[in-house]
Design a protein with these regions (language model features):
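Protein maturation boundaries and topogenic segments
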Residues: 1-86, 160-164, 168-185
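Extracellular/periplasmic catalytic domains that process cell-envelope and extracellular macromolecules
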Residues: 51, 69, 92, 100-101, ...
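Structural motif
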Residues: 56, 71-75, 97, 138, ...
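Short, surface-exposed secondary-structure boundary micro-motifs
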Residues: 63, 81, 104, 112, ...
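Mid-length scaffold segments of soluble, non-membrane domains
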Residues: 86-112
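PP2C/PPM family metal-dependent serine/threonine protein phosphatase catalytic domain
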Residues: 109-126
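Beta-strand-rich cores of mature extracytoplasmic or soluble domains
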Residues: 128, 133-185
């Protein structure tokens, strides 16, 4: 009888240990995925309309930029201080380039007109006081809704260092009727 009780107690202990290890493994894998693979990001505001809208839920891909550099027109996610929030913007200017926005809204890269059709609303220089030369690891970003976007045209945001780019907006989770990969080309 005592042997049966000991076996039952040992079996319950093994089951508890097994469950604890399983939960720990799930938590560890979840942490690693969120830390290194992807994170959920919510669109706050209308700066990326019509591409993204307020309340859209996205998955940010954190892996791609370990294997290649960001490209022009990628939609990137980066933190914005002093508030602890993320900005979602489109890359317009690449490292080493000169970006200029004329009063008529034309965007120039190294003196050449940038051919793009993402801009919504009027593109104005805002706080830019002439051409902006990007450093070796800096990007110039704009929101698609140019009239309301707080982006690289403003001192508060400025040029974005490569080191703070978390990843690229990759997948729209919500709203469900718009679920799918975000194409940026």
């Amino acid at each position: 009888m005592k042997e049966n009780e000991n076996e039952n107690a040992n079996g319950k202990i093994r089951e508890i240990i097994s469950n604890v290890l399983y939960i720990a493994a799930v938590l560890l894998i979840s942490f690693l995925i969120v830390r290194y693979v992807g994170q959920r990001t919510e669109v706050i505001g209308s700066s990326m309309v019509p591409t993204l809208e307020d309340g859209n839920q996205l998955i940010t891909d954190k892996i791609t930029y370990h294997f290649r550099e960001p490209e022009r027109f990628d939609i990137v996610v980066f933190p914005h201080a002093p508030v602890n929030e993320f900005y979602i913007k489109r890359i317009i200017g690449m490292p080493g380039e000169t970006v200029e926005i004329a009063d008529d809204g034309t965007i120039y890269i190294n003196g050449e007109v940038l051919e793009e059709n993402y801009g919504y609303g009027e593109t104005r220089p805002q706080e830019m006081s002439g051409p902006v030369l990007l450093g070796d690891n800096e990007y110039f970003v704009l929101g698609d809704n140019r009239e309301v976007s707080l982006d690289s045209r403003y001192r508060e945001v400025g040029n974005i260092p490569r080191s703070i780019i978390i990843g690229r907006a990759w997948l729209r989770l919500y709203p469900f009727d718009q679920f799918g990969l975000l194409t940026d080309k």
